[in-house]
Swiss-Prot record:
Organism: Burkholderia cenocepacia (strain HI2424)
Catalytic activity from the UniProt record: N-acetyl-L-glutamate + ATP = N-acetyl-L-glutamyl 5-phosphate + ADP
InterPro entries: AceGlu_kinase-like_sf, AcgluKinase_fam, ArgB, Asp/Glu/Uridylate_kinase, NAGK-C
This protein's name: Acetylglutamate kinase
Function summary: Catalyzes the ATP-dependent phosphorylation of N-acetyl-L-glutamate.
């Protein structure tokens, strides 16, 4: 990846052109909600973390309402390693026993979330951290993982949940008070248990419930790639099904693309997978006409 651009070296006239290009997009998204799934390198490299914080602050300042749903897989793996426990995944989902769930809760709801909140606040924004347990935000139920090798059978992967319902009242209240919500993907079940929910799934469901104008999912790759490593810039539901069938989309990309497609089918107007390794990727996708990442379409 190329070295980051030194903005101080950009000529004033070019800066003005950049701002002028952003104006129609600011008008389009003014007053609208944009849900951002935040994860990957953008959460671990200091330069990218600071760039992301500034991006969401700018969106809020120009009247766009960002809602952040964050992951934290590498941080969870690191914490598990410290206690001598290895992470196990099935079909892109983390197997979560009781001990792992305790680690997930304090890593996501504590360390990772607070790092994001503090960074946004440090640069002049007003962020508030939530888990799905706060304000009854995310009602969850145990996820039954279909066993692909044994049709009709299911695999028990522990305290892994799926979204049963979302109560967006607390998120809307924060938006109305000019705050930026930062949400950890932990839900609560009627059985009294906490559930680890894939952050991509939470972001997609939340975008649908909030009637978001855009869902943006950040990854460590340029977007959805074909088997030859070429970027696929535009994918329909039929094309995605074919990529599932031939194994092009697999592992951790399975829940991401499934969630993106579900959101598109449920009325989210614009769904994009973007490369979070690119500095200011959020602003590039939302406020410029530059084609970026992969657009997911429902038809």
């Amino acid at each position: 990846m190329s070295e980051p651009i030194d903005l101080s070296q950009i000529a004033p006239t070019l800066k003005a052109e950049i701002l002028a290009e952003a104006l129609p997009y600011i008008r389009r998204y003014h007053g609208k909600t944009v849900v951002i799934k935040y994860g990957g390198n953008a959460m671990t490299e200091e330069r990218l973390k600071q760039g992301f914080a500034r991006d969401v602050i700018l969106l809020k300042l120009v009247g766009i309402n960002p809602v952040i749903v964050h992951g934290g897989g590498p941080q969870i793996d690191h914490a598990l390693k410290k206690i001598g426990k290895a992470g196990t995944f099935i079909q892109g989902m983390r197997v979560t026993d009781e001990e792992t769930m305790e680690v997930v809760e304090w890593v996501l709801g504590g360390e990772v979330q607070q790092d994001i909140v503090m960074l946004i606040n440090h640069f002049g924004g007003h962020a508030v951290g939530l888990t799905g347990k706060d304000g009854g935000l995310i009602h969850a139920r145990k996820l039954l993982m279909p066993d692909r090798d044994n049709p009709g059978q299911y695999i028990d992967i522990g305290q892994v949940g799926e979204v049963e319902a979302i109560n967006p009242a607390v998120v809307k209240a924060l938006q109305d008070d000019a705050f930026i919500p930062v949400i950890s993907p932990i839900g609560f079940g009627e059985d009294g248990l906490s559930y680890n929910i894939n952050a991509d799934l939470v972001a997609g469901k939340l975008a649908t419930v909030l009637n978001a104008e855009k869902l943006l999912m950040m990854t460590n790759i340029p977007g959805v790639m074909d088997k030859d490593g070429n970027l696929l810039t535009d994918l329909s539901a039929r094309e995605i099904d074919a990529l599932f069938e031939d194994g092009t989309i697999s592992g951790g990309m399975l829940p991401k693309i499934s969630s993106a497609l579900d959101a598109a089918k449920s009325g989210v107007k614009s769904v994009h997978i973007v490369d979070g390794r690119i500095e200011h990727s959020v602003l590039l996708e939302i406020l410029t006409e530059q084609p970026f990442g992969t657009m997911i379409r429902s038809h």
